[in-house]
Amino acid sequence: MTRRNKRFLSLLLALTLAVSLCVLPAAAADQTCPSSKDDPVVFVHGLMGWGQRAGINAMLPYWGMTTGSLTSYLNSLGYETYSATVGPISSAWDRACELYAQLTGTTVDYGAAHSAAHDHARYGITYDRPLFSGWGTKRAVNLVGHSFGGATTRLFLELMTNGSAEEVAAAKAAGTAPSPLFTGGKSSWVHSMTEVAAPHNGTSFIESNGTIMDVATNLSETLAKGFGITEIKNLYDFQLEQFGIYKDPNETVLETLQRVFSTDFMSHNDNAFLDLTIDKSLEINDGIGIEPNVYYFSYAGNQTVQDPVSGNYIPSAKMWTLFYPGAYNMGKYYDKYTAGGFYIDKSWRPNDGMVNTVSAFYPIHSDGTCLTKDGKQGWTNYDGYSNIHFQPGLWYVMPVQSFDHIQFVGGMLNGSLVKTRALYRGIMEDIYSTYTTAATGTAFPFTDVAESRWSYPYIKELYDAGVVSGTSATTFSPAANVTRAQFVTMLAGLAGADVSNCPATPFRDVPEGAWYAPYVNWALANGIVSGTSA
């Protein structure tokens, strides 16, 4: 036994009666990208939005709206920021593919399988150059998504991490190479993800505003077709070339009009309006995990107040007037089931005019859970001011903001320059504070182990060494007793042991599928334990 292991063993023995632990998950293979404070921030817009590539952005920047360009302001403070441009009404999948192509400066590949399933072209527009240099080789990216930009960036990260076996197989069958987006192994290319007013779990706006939604979808499709074949496309681009909505120079004007306006975009079931429903959002969430190396932040808004008579939620005086009808309907829509069986309770009434406040906290799966890959709670509330070290692999739910949906990006006539810029200065500070944490070693996350506690230095040293973790993302339970199973798990971690091929023990109280079974098997095989009975 080395001197180092002897030292750690003595620490374990000292803590035997005072600590508890959980098994640390194994790290996944990754095409590692270095991460540093040189990593830029890329903003991803929501439904009907635009980025710096759109002509309209010079006149009315999406990020900043009537308060002026937010990215220019943040750049003046020394931050490197960009605003991506993806399809305003495209699905989360298509937008994720477009985001990848924009970050790499390539042609959009929507995937052979996805394109066939939704009956549209596999390839889309070409981005002439990367949004910034060095992504994936020298720098990672920090993503900030507003509204539907949340689902876009979360699905993007999932594909970057785990890829799509279906798309790889479909590309091979077609005799083509898959997009690198679908091969996965690139989670370290994303350092953090911040979502503002993002309907992680869908929005009841769609369910409660049927007439408004019918008008919105029909108008959007008509505008997309008209803009797509005229010079207005340079000002505002719906980017629906994959559906045949584009101007063909080899056609007459009449031929183009007939071809484009005969298409039925909504019938492809590959659009933002569908993905924003509660049922579809939960379906998307079921395929997305929380990555242990990525930092997550989420901001929800509420610009409604409770009616003292009905108890429902109505728009506040500070909400943009155009949001009033939708917000009012959302504020009284509850005690109902979606077509997929999700129950909308009273907590879904407060909203920002477009998104339910509760839906913007953190993403849940269809079973209602939000868990890390090792089964722990995947979110925690943060008060916005406590001096803590943010940890990766955990959603930090920030304090609810008194913003309507558009005030989060500057507002329309009701925006506040001071409030908007203060919000994003805080977001930048939180993002870049995570690099300070990384540079000074593994941050100690346990709020129930004060530095003044006698066991603090021992627990911290074992935590830094990867021998122990906590009973949750932020708790260690230092007064809890240690079980025999937990102790041999610590010993195996200390020894760096391979516990995968040890024969099973005869102990009836060690089920084969138990998390601790491999560690007990290892301990018995090496003569460390003998059992409390035969």
Where are these regions (language model features)?
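Feature responds to low-complexity, polar/acidic, surface-exposed segments characteristic
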Residues: 26-28, 440-456, 469-488, 492-517, ...
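Helical cap/lid subdomain of alpha/beta-hydrolase-fold lipid enzymes
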Residues: 158, 163-440
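Sec-dependent signal peptide cleavage junction
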Residues: 21-31
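Bacterial N-terminal signal peptides that target proteins for export
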Residues: 2-12
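Extracellular/surface recognition and adhesion modules
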Residues: 17, 459-462, 523
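Hydrophobic core
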Residues: 13-17, 21
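Extracytoplasmic/secreted envelope proteins and their assembly/folding machinery
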Residues: 67, 71, 93-96, 100, ...
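N-terminal non-catalytic accessory region
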Residues: 29-217, 384, 389-440
